[in-house]
A protein has these predicted regions:
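Sec-dependent N-terminal signal peptides
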Residues: 5-13
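N-terminal, active-site-proximal structural segment of metallo-dependent hydrolase catalytic domains
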Residues: 16-86, 97-104, 181, 293
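Active-site-proximal beta-strand elements of phosphoester/diester hydrolases
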Residues: 31-43, 107, 120-124, 149, ...
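Catalytic metal-binding/acid-base residues of hydrolase active sites
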Residues: 40, 76, 167-169, 202-205, ...
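Structured beta-strand-rich core segments of catalytic domains in phosphoester-bond hydrolases
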Residues: 69-160, 269
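Active-site neighborhood of phospho(di)ester-bond hydrolases with catalytic His/Asp-centered motifs
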Residues: 70-73, 95, 197-201, 223-226
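Metal-dependent phosphoester/phosphodiester hydrolase catalytic core
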Residues: 142-144, 153-181, 190
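Metal-dependent phosphoester-hydrolase catalytic domains
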Residues: 151, 174, 178, 185-196, ...
Length: 293
């Protein structure tokens, strides 16, 4: 009986390993994989969905898809440090939104150090407020909100580009609109060469004016969902709570945006779950992209 169990475990491990290798090899050599993932902050009132009950699933999911960059939202410092310990090939940038250090939620940006390096002095977090250089909130925002970004170099190609990660306010419409304008201004200031990606939980659907501010005019932010050369894979929603349900309406509030000189090869929203529950109340969004030479 023990021998049979061990044999089955070995077979499962081999199949899982082969599946992972197929996933890795399916990605084109010069392409870049991006993920945006709201982790849900460690709330002790979440019961069965508390962080300690799902953190291994979150780490396993990220490890399996192995994005070159992933921007997480809502994670507290111990959640970010847990992922840092579990995902050894990654480093990260970001600060707590409450004090600019370790307090409060982070919108940290994680990158694979095997292939990419952060260009010295470019990693930064600003507040989406009228005083962006200090912990603050403005307009009708319920909470402080931040934008974390850095300029990275691909060690294999030498190409340099910016990646931005953010989490917009869940209450203040004016704050969200002004936050969108701040991001556009920051892109225009730093990435005028057109090499950039924007990840985040924007807390708006496509019919909200914030989406129009982001996607219209210059600098252009192209929704990877609509520009994928291959059909979208997975659900059409990114936020519906922990419990798996049927008949969920389209509700994308988490996005990956790309610049004009980028091909989007693939786009997916990942609906993995265990025992009827997702590992977070948001689903991760992933895209495979490639710069146009």
């Amino acid at each position: 009986m023990i021998k049979t169990g061990l044999t089955l475990l070995l077979l499962v491990s081999i199949v899982a390993g082969c599946a992972h290798e197929r996933h890795q090899s399916a990605q084109q050599e010069d392409s870049i994989s991006l993920m945006s993932y709201n982790l849900r902050f460690d709330n002790p009132n979440d019961g069965i969905n508390a962080w300690d009950n799902r953190k291994e699933h979150v780490a396993a999911l990220i490890r399996f898809y192995a994005p070159d960059f992933f921007g997480q939202q809502e994670g507290l410092i111990h959640q970010v440090e847990y992922l840092d310990d579990e995902l050894e090939e990654y480093d990260w940038i970001g600060v707590g939104r409450d004090d600019g250090d370790r307090a409060g939620e982070l919108s940290s940006l994680h990158y694979n150090t095997v292939r990419f390096e952060l260009i010295e002095g470019t990693g930064q977090t600003i507040w989406l407020s009228e005083t962006p250089d200090e912990p603050s909130r403005s307009w009708d925002a319920a909470l402080p909100r931040v934008l974390t970004f850095g300029k990275f170099r691909d060690k294999t190609t030498g190409r340099e580009f910016y990646v931005f990660n953010t989490h917009f306010d869940h209450i203040g419409q004016t704050a969200r609109e002004e936050s969108a304008r701040i991001i556009k201004q920051k892109i225009e200031e730093l990435a005028s060469d057109g090499n950039y990606f924007v990840l985040g939980d924007f807390n708006v659907r496509e019919d909200n004016p914030v989406y129009e501010i982001l996607t219209m005019g210059n600098p252009p932010l192209r929704d990877a969902f609509y520009h994928s050369e291959n059909p979208h894979v997975g659900p059409l929603f990114t936020f519906e709570g922990f419990e798996v349900k049927s008949g969920v309406e389209q509700r994308r509030i988490d996005y990956i945006f790309v610049s004009e000189n980028v091909r989007v090869l693939n786009h997916a929203i990942l609906g993995h779950f265990r025992n009827g529950y997702y590992p977070s109340d948001h689903l991760p969004v992933i895209a495979e992209v490639m710069f146009v030479e």
